Each structure stands twice: as C-alpha cells, then as structure tokens.
Regions:
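Pre-NBD coupling/linker segments of ABC/ABC-like ATPases
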Residues: 2-42, 231-246
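Conserved ABC ATPase "signature" region
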Residues: 24-31, 111, 123-140
Length: 246
C-alpha cells in the first residue's frame, strides 16, 4: 500500500485584483463588494503515489506548485479538489522553527515540540541530549529562542524533527541550514534515515543535491505534473527545459 497517495489534486487561490494598503481598507472594500478576485490554480489535477522507503524529490521553478504540494501532503493545507492520503506519521520540515514559542528557551521548546508530536516527557528526556548535541546549542540551551539567529533556530528545528523519527520526512529547502559543516551533518542524518526505511519527500532547487538524496523525481510545471521517474533523468530533462527558456 502506498504511504502517500495523491489523486487528481487541484489547489485554487483567490488573488485580489488590486492592492490594499491596510487591513481596514481591505475590510471596507470587501464589505462593500468593491474587492474583486482572480482565481489562480497552483496545482491542477496532479496524481502520483509514493511507496514506503522511497526517496522522492519535487522539482520545478519558483511558483510551479511544488511547495504547495508538499504542504498539502504535510496537512498544512487542504486541496480544493481531489484527495491526499498519508498512511504514516509525517515530520514536516517546511518552515524550521515555525512552531517554537520565541519567549521560551531551547530546552523548553524541545519538550513543547515533543508534546505537539505526541511524545511524553520521559520520551523527550531520553532524546534531549542527542537533540542539543546535534544542534550544537549547549552554550545557549537555556537562552530564550527570541535571542537566537535564524540559523540557530533552524538547527534546533531540524534536530528535533529528525531525532524524533517519523515514517515520512517532508523537507522544503532545509539543507541550507547553517554553515557547510552543519549542512553536511544534515545530509548525513537524512541518509541514515533513508537507510532505516524512512520515506523522504524533498523540495529543492539544488539539482545535484536532489540527485544525491533521491532516486525518484517528480517535476511540477505551472501546476501540472510534467515528469515522474528516475531522478537523474527527470532532473536532466528539467535543466534542459530551463536552458531552452521553457
């Protein structure tokens, strides 16, 4: 049975035809029926399935719909049409640290995130040292996260999500975290998770990274499925299309 099943999925957004400067202006125009919208389809009738243990990349130019698809699979959004079925626990690495309480320390946020993911304190006690070790944040573990750099927040988020293992890891451009050495640590950890049977769904503009991590690539172009197959073949076709200006 597929671990991810996407059937005839479309995602529609309503975009305002004119820009409003303030929330008050937007509300007044909306109530007076003076605000008009254009329909925009980020995805149109996309279907595919992913088997347990597969490593799959979603590729495409900016605005192609790949990140929207990842958010639908992660349950962050719901499709306008069609269905998305996920048969397993998913760890979404879409906006690292988005679930943190900025007033709390790293220590407190580790336990908070663990609770959100359904793990009790005893479980998080067992994994706490590994999380902080990997994130390299022992010197700042009791400092409020609001004082962290964006890179430190991202490191903590990646460490929590990948230490507390899930069936599916859904990643959006996350290997740009920190310096080169930390990026390599992230890459190695993802390789370990793949070896352990975790299913990977990966969004990236780095074609070389896609080829290294993923055996399969799904190419989304202007909201449509344009290619699906071995990552090297699909990536080469995508690059060739970009070079032709398509």
């Amino acid at each position: 049975m597929p671990i991810i099943q996407v059937d005839n999925v479309s995602m529609r957004f309503n975009l305002a035809q004119e820009k409003t400067e303030t929330l008050k202006e937007y509300t007044v125009k909306l109530l007076k029926h003076q605000l008009f919208f254009n329909e925009f389809y980020a995805l149109q009738d996309v279907s595919f399935s992913i088997e347990p243990g597969e490593s799959v990349a979603l590729i495409g130019r900016n605005g192609s719909g790949k990140s929207t698809m990842l958010k639908l699979i992660a349950g962050v959004m719901y499709p306008s049409k069609g269905s998305v079925r996920v048969n397993g626990e998913i760890a979404p690495l879409i906006e690292l640290g988005a679930g943190f309480d900025m007033e709390l320390t790293a220590r407190e946020n580790v336990y908070l995130n663990g609770a959100v993911l359904g793990h009790d304190r005893a479980y998080m006690d067992e994994h706490f040292k590994n999380i902080i070790d990997f994130a390299e944040l022992w010197d700042f573990v009791d400092v409020p996260v609001k004082n962290y750099s964006s890179g430190m927040i991202a490191r903590l988020g990646f460490s929590i999500a990948t230490e507390v293992r899930a069936d599916i890891l859904a990643c959006d451009e996350i290997l740009s975290v920190g310096d080169f050495m930390f990026q390599q640590k992230c890459h190695d950890r993802m390789e370990q998770m793949l070896s352990g049977g975790t299913t990977l769904l990966f969004v990236s503009h780095d074609i070389n990274q896609v080829k290294q991590l993923c055996r399969r690539a799904i190419w989304i172009d202007h909201g449509h499925l344009r290619g699906d197959g071995p990552s090297a073949e699909v990536c080469d076709a995508y690059v060739a299309a970009m070079q032709r200006g398509e």
